[in-house]
Swiss-Prot record:
Gene3D superfamilies: 3.40.50.970, TPP-binding domain (3.40.50.1220). Homodimer. CDD domains: TPP_PYR_MenD, TPP_SHCHC_synthase. This is 2-succinyl-5-enolpyruvyl-6-hydroxy-3-cyclohexene-1-carboxylate synthase. InterPro entries: DHS-like_NAD/FAD-binding_dom (IPR029035), MenaQ_synth_MenD (IPR004433), MenD_middle (IPR032264), THDP-binding (IPR029061), Thiamin_PyroP_enz_TPP-bd_dom (IPR012001). Residues 192-215 are annotated as: Disordered. GO terms for biological process: menaquinone biosynthetic process; organic acid metabolic process; sulfur compound biosynthetic process. The lineage of its organism: Archaea, Methanobacteriati, Methanobacteriota, Stenosarchaea group, Halobacteria. It comes from the Archaea. Belongs to the TPP enzyme family. MenD subfamily. Keywords: Magnesium, Manganese, Menaquinone biosynthesis, Metal-binding, Thiamine pyrophosphate, Transferase. GO terms for molecular function: 2-succinyl-5-enolpyruvyl-6-hydroxy-3-cyclohexene-1-carboxylic-acid synthase activity; magnesium ion binding; manganese ion binding; thiamine pyrophosphate binding.
Amino acid sequence: MTAPNRNTLWARALIDELVAAGVDAVVASPGSRSTPLTVAAARTDDLRVFSQLDERSAAYFALGRARRTGKVTPLICTSGTAAANYHPAVMEASEARVPLLALTADRPPELRDSGANQTADQEKLYGDAVRFYKDLPEPAPNDRALRSLRTTVARAVGTAEGADPGPVHLNVPFKKPLEPTRVLDDVPADLDPVAERGRDGPYVDVTPGSPEPGDDALRRLGNELMTTDRGLIVAGPADPPGLDAEAVTALSHATGFPILADPLSGVRFGGHTRVAPVIGAYDAYLSAEVAGEAGDADASDSWNDPEVVLRLGASPTSKRLRKYLAETGADQYQVDPAGRWREAEFAATDLVVAEPSRLCARLSRLVAGGDGDADWRAQWEDADRVAQEIHGRERDGDIPADDEPVEFHEGDALRVVADALPDPATLFVSNSMPVRDLDRFVGPTTTSVTALGNRGVSGIDGIVSSALGAGSATTDDLTLVVGDLALYHDTNGLLALDRCDVDATVVLINNDGGGIFHELPIESFEPEFTESFKTPHGIEFEPMADLHGLAYTRIDARPDSVESAGNVADDLADAYTGARDADGSHLIEVRTDAESSHRTRKRLEAAVDRAVHGDEAE
């Protein structure tokens, strides 16, 4: 059917081309100038439209969905500050390599720099954060313009999902009328059908690149792995859609190297952990100082250094692991499909341009039969077992060689939730302390868990929206573990529970402010610490749960409110299991004391260090 006007024709062609390129959902926010795009999306049968009121939340929702699927999720917004509100999520997508497409509607060019209402300079609005940018021409109802439009859209999607995935930006100007009203003689009746309606499939089929080392380079790397006794595979936070755990496991078996798996790598959790040496508690015993026993000496000095390290994904969450790797002196191969540098300690000796999972699969076939050093592998496995045992005993009220009362701490909350996750599950963790506690206190498990977080630029904004976006792309049960400040930053995101039909169990770790700053030297400087860093707020979250229709449970885990860590853990386990199995969404608020949790982390650190590097745990 002939379009009623050129804007409708243009928007319809753009949206059609997105669907042809494999897009199955868009996230749109209400606005006038974007009307042609929103209407075209709403009238497309093969496209799901998520309507989000707030553009910042919308962008993070799309980010979370794209992170979960590895496929581009377009955004649609009107002109002006609406487009600017996408910027934080675009920054995260750029650093974390998440495919996004920002479709920002705009006034026509003659109104720019004219004082016209709701008009700003949107050209290259996101700067170098996007992989591809195009300021589209005004809609033109002719064959050449439509072919150009379709080609540009196909290129944008192909770039967003390419070897170096990330956000792309198309700025789309429209004149009035913006609604699908008929304008006499605005659209010719004799348009080329291919230009008007597209081809079967994408107008331009963009074949993604697959960088791989040549045979000679692969043999050299394989030979070094095969002749190395003490090697490590370090799996950092993975680019969407994640590392292939089976391929990484196969390489571990072929070389005999243990896998140090970040919780966001896609390798720490899953059935492969039954047979692979997956190490997860390294943050508890690497580079730890034993207070009063080892002085300033690094406990990791007692370990032999690795000879070779194969690094996959982004830089690990664990600062201690990064420090350990920086000081080893080993040959370190940083694997990156786009040839970008992602290792801020500058300890890597080689940059291997390759897709990590495919490289692991090729290397595992090449070096099959390597054993590595059994004692070296056992050292890591034993240390991990000891750390997990001590963390488990602490839950039962027993820190080895420590006679002080045991207090429930925030890391316990992560362990309780992880132990009770269904199979399969999607777990989204906030930045600040939750992701660090997940890293240190939750070891490998056979449960199929997709663990996600925003570790690109590691902000605490947009966490709720990102989690719900991820939940919109899966039938898994969705759990979000979030801090109080991160939840406060993104309460608008909770609107998606109802508007986008997503259910979630939200576990809120409320320590009344910036608990992570207890981990930093600024803690010693008062009153600046409390007034400008800790920033206690006293917010009550139950009314917020009522506002957004979440069932609510409060668990008070502060030391002056409980008898033992075990009681709180049991209460949390019961609350989480009940919420998980119930219909709808649930907020479980766990009130904690940041200073107490900080002390308990330090006590556990010392206990693990004594057991792994010094005296045996009692």
